[in-house]
Amino acid sequence: MFNFLRLSNTPQLTALGGVNISQQSDDIGLAFNNPALLTPRMHSQMNAVFNDFYGGIKVFHLSLGYRNEKLNTNFLWGLNYFNYGSITETDAAGNVFGKFRPTDWVMQVSASRSYLEKWNYGAAIKWISSNYGQFRSNGIATDIGVLFSDTTRLFSASFLVKNLGVQLKRYNNAEQEELPFDLQAGITKRLEKAPFSFSLTAQRLQQFDIL
């Protein structure tokens, strides 16, 4: 359930394959995906994305960054909103009861700090909601990330605990469902004399039986 949490929220992440936690950039949209990527350079940054798909499906994303010098902490507020258009509501016999507009959204607050010169760590708290007509659900989750960055060697590595949480309200009193929990690890190496970098990201590390 809540599988929309797996989707990319920003064009740069989509261009990187949809899953990347170690690519450092000034794009605050990447920090929405991994709080350890949130840096002081993102103070006062805003990332706004709108996608219009077939069938009336629309996706909105907004991220805002803020740096508090007194707390020595970086903050991010972000929202991902999915509108699936207008759908006709019927019963099993085909009787029409009207229309409804299903939506999914997640709102989160992230914070990060640096440790020594090469480490950065961060966490995010997420409020998740789904509305499919009479079927509604919500939940709460957290992301926890750590980033190691060696600017001299142009190398970075990160580990991320993603979507660790619980469903608070079930769909129409259905059974309790699990969130799309994920353990991810990634490395990025930038070439010294060329404008390229290579990334390797492993996901779903908690699933030992992958066959």
Annotated model-derived regions:
Residues 20-62:
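Active-site-flanking structural segment that lines cofactor/substrate pockets
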Residues 1-17, 21, 43, 58-211:
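Outer-membrane beta-barrel porins/channels
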